[in-house]
């Protein structure tokens, strides 16, 4: 997974192309590009046609992602970029807050998967709020599965908190882990 940002602090455009070529030579390896589809991400998706594109609604000013897609407000715009990516043969995942009622909206705009934004789970682990937060994630994963979506998860995950999340959210297909 790479997250090319307009400020190029994580990866440069040439790196995206080079990494795509490298991974295509390794059968069975997937290439996921994540970022804001309304900035520069779609140019990369068109150029390299990754296995998966994860649409994250971050802004230029953000140091890191801090919220999921607001499909109630921006659903029509996401529907267009999802359709474009899928027409290129790219699986699409939408970065989503753990709100079970919004999982069907991701399916309605054409997404194949959602990625649960797990920062709130990681932040509450070991506190009195942890059980309720874990339940919210489990319900969101269940709702996504019932809507016919694959489920990814990521943000502030580590070996210290991953197992508990995977046990509670049995439908998770893929995780992005920050540290071991």
State the predicted function of each range.
Residues 3, 54-62, 113-125, 170-180:
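Glycine-rich phosphate-binding active-site loops on the catalytic face of alpha/beta enzymes
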């Amino acid at each position: 997974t790479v997250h090319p940002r307009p400020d190029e602090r994580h990866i440069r455009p040439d790196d995206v192309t080079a990494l795509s070529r490298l991974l295509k030579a390794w059968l069975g390896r997937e290439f996921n590009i994540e970022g804001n589809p309304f900035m520069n991400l779609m140019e990369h998706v068109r150029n390299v046609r990754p296995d998966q594109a994860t649409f994250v609604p971050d802004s230029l000013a953000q140091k890191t992602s801090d919220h999921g897609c607001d499909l109630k407000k921006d659903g029509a715009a996401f529907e267009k970029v999802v359709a474009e990516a899928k027409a290129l043969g790219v699986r699409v995942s939408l970065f989503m807050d753990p709100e079970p009622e919004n999982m069907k909206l991701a399916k309605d705009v054409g997404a194949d998967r959602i990625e649960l934004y797990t920062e709130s789970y990681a932040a509450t682990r070991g506190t009195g709020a942890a059980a309720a937060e874990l339940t919210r994630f489990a319900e969101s994963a269940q709702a996504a599965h019932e809507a016919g979506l694959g489920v990814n998860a990521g943000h502030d995950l580590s070996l210290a908190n991953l197992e508990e999340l995977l046990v509670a959210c049995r439908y998770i297909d893929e995780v992005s882990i920050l540290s071991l």
